[in-house]
Amino acid sequence: MNILIAIGGRDYSKPTLDLGMKIANSLEASTTIAYVGKKVSQFSEKDVSVVHQNLDERQLYRPGVRTLEWAYDFLKSKNYIQEETNDFNDHLLVDEENSRMRVLLKGKHSNKIDLILRTGEIIEQLRSEVQTNNHDITVIGGGKNKGMHHDLVQFIDSSVLVVKNYSFKKKYKVLLPVNNSVGSRNAIEIAE
């Protein structure tokens, strides 16, 4: 079972990350936590690589890394990751492909959790992440951009859970709407 948790800003993503990790933990699923940042234009790519080198020398972070650092700290605080070393740093980022970077994690449970930084259009990048890594469930926040959520539900090829108005203190029941589609059969298997 593979779960993708899409996060945005720190303030809005805490409920999404919390619920997504509770679900992933209960299903003992491999989990990818992804942040999608803005893509830099091709004309600026050389300048950006020079700037990234300068940022590394000055120990400053690339855009989006602070959000991943927040997610990393959140995972540690909830004991989803138990690291031998306590520091998150930019040197743990590994370029994997054009618009995807992964944070190397070490320690207990880290083989089942990936922190990913992608750049580009949100829907396109999340769709690519789901297709490339065969995610069964995508967890997204229920923010104010309703059109984007509609598009994500429509175009992402996995089950989608939208987290909106989630309270850490309240217990919830889940309504699982199904029909006779292949996706519904998978959802029923997962729920059982």
State what each model feature region is:
Residues M1-R66, W70-Y72, K76, Y80-E83, ...:
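Small/aliphatic-rich secondary-structure junction motif
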Residues S13, L17-L19, L115-K170:
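Gly/Ser-rich helix-loop-strand patches that form or flank binding pockets
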Residues E28, E45-S49, L55-D56, N89-E96, ...:
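Short alpha-helical interface elements
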Residues V40-E45, D95-S99, V160-V162:
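Short hydrophobic/aromatic-rich motifs at helix boundaries and adjacent loops
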Residues Q42, L93, M148, K170-K171:
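Short secondary-structure boundary/hinge segments and terminal tails
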Residues E57, H109-I113, K144-H150, L175:
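Acidic/glycine-enriched edge-of-secondary-structure segments
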Residues D73-T138, K144:
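Structural beta-alpha unit
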